[in-house]
A protein has these predicted regions:
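Short pre-active-site segment immediately N-terminal to the catalytic Zn-binding motif
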Residues: 1-8
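Post-HEXXH active-site segment of zinc metalloproteases
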Residues: 20-41
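An active-site-proximal "capping" alpha-helix that borders the catalytic cofactor pocket
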Residues: 36-53
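Long, well-structured alpha-helical subdomains associated
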Residues: 48-148
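Extracellular/surface-associated beta-sandwich interaction domains
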Residues: 149-164, 183, 197
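Conserved small/polar residues in nucleotide/adenosyl-binding loops
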Residues: 199-201
């Protein structure tokens, strides 16, 4: 949990946002109001794909791929459920990071349905999303990363709109109601924060 989250954040901020090129004549304005969500999705997908790379174990960045699996579980759970505790019932997602997380989690869930990559389970009146195939999920993250990078590089406004509007905006009202009720009973904060320390060299 903790290690995976930190490594994901490092990959997202340092390498995710720091990678990828746009074609000549293409800029942020090409994607208009969808740019921020696409860029956050690209950085998250970079982190999600590479956190499962065995090279990170070889380099000693993570002790084992179990760290990556834990991060996959956390990401899917947050993207499909946990973050909904911050949204009023009946509202759509508006914030770029939240749209990005739902976009990614919903897209890989849908595209992996035929192979049961992520299973939606209902038990005792509660919904759970269980990852059944981590390698297949990593490949789906890679597929979506390639598409999101293409959208950004080419300034494909329609491609960005289709991804975000189809996967990142609307919330399943039944699941949303369930999430709100479950978290109200837990009495825990829907937000967590971290502080980046300043290093003087």
């Amino acid at each position: 949990g903790y290690v995976g989250g930190n490594v994901h954040t490092d990959l997202h901020e340092c390498l995710g946002h720091g990678s990828g090129k746009m074609l000549p004549g293409v800029g942020q304005e090409s994607l208009k109001n969808y740019y921020s969500t696409i860029e956050e999705a690209r950085a998250d997908l970079f982190a999600l794909y590479y956190v499962m790379d065995p090279k990170l174990v070889e380099l000693g960045v993570i002790p084992s791929l179990e760290v990556a699996k834990s991060e996959y579980c956390n990401y899917i759970r947050n993207g499909l459920m946990v973050q909904l505790t911050r949204v009023k019932l009946g509202n759509n997602l508006e914030e770029s990071h939240m749209r990005n997380r739902q976009l990614i989690a919903s897209w890989v869930y849908e595209k992996g349905k035929a192979d049961n990559v992520i299973e939606r389970v209902s038990r005792d009146g509660k919904t759970y999303f269980t990852i059944r195939d981590y390698e297949a999920l990593r490949k789906l993250f890679g597929r979506l990363l390639a598409e999101v990078q293409r959208v950004k590089s080419e300034g494909d406004f329609e491609g960005a709109r289709n991804l975000i509007e189809n996967y990142g905006v609307r919330i399943d009202p039944v699941l949303h109601q369930e999430v709100l009720e479950r978290y109200q009973k837990l009495n825990v904060a829907p937000y967590a924060g971290f502080v980046l320390s300043l290093i003087h060299i």
